[in-house]
Amino acid sequence: MSYRIAMVCDFFFPQPGGVESHIYQLSTNLIDRGHKVIIITHAYEGRTGVRYLTNGLKVYHVPFFVIYRETTFPTVFSFFPIFRNIIIREQIEIVHGHGSLSSLCHEAIIHARSMGLRTVFTDHSLYGFADAGSILTNKLLKFTLSDVDHVICVSHTCKENTVLRASLDPLMVSVIPNAVVAENFRPLTQTEPLISPHDAKWLAPNQTIGPHDTITIVVISRLFYNKGTDLLIAAIPRICAAHPHVRFIIAGSGPKAIDVEQMLERNVLQDRVEMLGPVRHEEVRDVMVRGQIYLHPSLTEAFGTVIVEAASCGLYVVCTQVGGIPEVLPPHMTTFAKPEEDDIVAATSKAISLMRNGKIQTANFHDQVRMMYSWTDVAERTERVYKGISGSLSEEEFYGYSPGEGWSAARGRAGVQSFALIDRLKRYYGCGIWAGKLFCLCIVIDYLIFVFLELWAPKAGVDIVRDWPRKKPITTGEAHRDGGGITRKKNKRRREKRWEDLDRHA
């Protein structure tokens, strides 16, 4: 059974990032499986209106005011008219929102429930409980997820965090990790030329590292506080002082870029640290293969897709032991450090020593990562969630027990709840003494706007768009796939048929 799905998030291409890549790869693989998928995001500079991407993936760039880090200004209700128009035009059945800090995501889930649509939310981040910003974010998340069909988290640590923040039943939260297109992140081969002539004097690809050969440490990250840029600034001078044959390549942009440049000038390290600035996602592999070690000093991370990409490129990973990072890669691919300056320096020095002593063999990293992570598998598991919330799977099959064995309130929030306004208000009313009443007021106003739109612009008067020609759904085991979901067997059959036709005419 195929579904019509709308992915909604503030964060999407052309902005690079893990959430953006996740949405794109998941959408294209769901299209390969026979579903219709559209993406709703805000307008970017040079990207407005409706755009088509690979495989007929349609992207709606909604003109909304951006306030901070590509997040739109939260208006609660003003998004409803254009959202309703898109949903009706595309005949959407499931609305899938991404990101706790995405205003479009939260508003889309609320409006979708008012329209009687099934909703799914994917959380990609970890947040605390103490500071004012986290408290407000968690309250907003609890508001939105009080009436959602299912929640997906990218790691078990992220699941625990989301369950606590939004007061959810753990049974209605699934863990589906991110993945990588392994074919796009291959190690540098012997026959492949060096990416940069500057690297030729440092180390040729696959060459044994001697005591005086230079080891290159790669860092690819947004230069923000939560990405551990302050730790990086403190650790680089100490690492360079302790290891004279070590250089750094830093790719990324952000408000901390000025601090990094000041550190380089203060310590006269311009000849040993190369700043590349922002790089496109398709250029990430070309940067990674220039090094032997990948350093990831993040202070908080739900999954860390970039370290999977680095391991796939054959780099040994040094990362902080925070959030869901310990779940991502096996121990022989990583060295963990506490999010402290001394520990970062010690862990990096340990990795350098292991590389020089030949105790780390990275030749098989790519094949191992390809076996562990696949977007095809992620799409299959996400499709199972869609089947569960739409009723195609029984509760016993989807949740793991017979109806009536679990908490009844959770069952009411886990995909079988009523769309009736009174039932929705009961769920929102339990969000707090004052917050519950405020949330109920917002939902009542939202429902009144929906009724007004139904009268003012009836559904029958909205033109239905023609669908992009769909592919035949690809089932598991039908053909050999690589990490990007490319089918090879089908192309082989087409070539054989073409050869048979040519022989027949000859």
Predicted regions and their residues:
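Conserved donor-binding/catalytic core segment of Leloir-type glycosyltransferases
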Residues: 197-237, 249
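Carbohydrate-associated surface elements
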Residues: 43, 157, 179
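Short hydrophobic beta-strand element within catalytic cores of glycosyltransferases
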Residues: 316-319
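Nucleotide-activated donor-binding/catalytic signature segment of Leloir-type glycosyltransferases, i.e.
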Residues: 261-279
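Short alpha-helical donor nucleotide-sugar binding micro-motif in glycosyltransferases
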Residues: 278-279, 286-291
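N-terminal subdomain of nucleotide-sugar transferases
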Residues: 1-47, 51, 55-58, 376, ...
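Aromatic "clamp/platform" in nucleotide-sugar-dependent glycosyltransferases that forms part
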Residues: 299
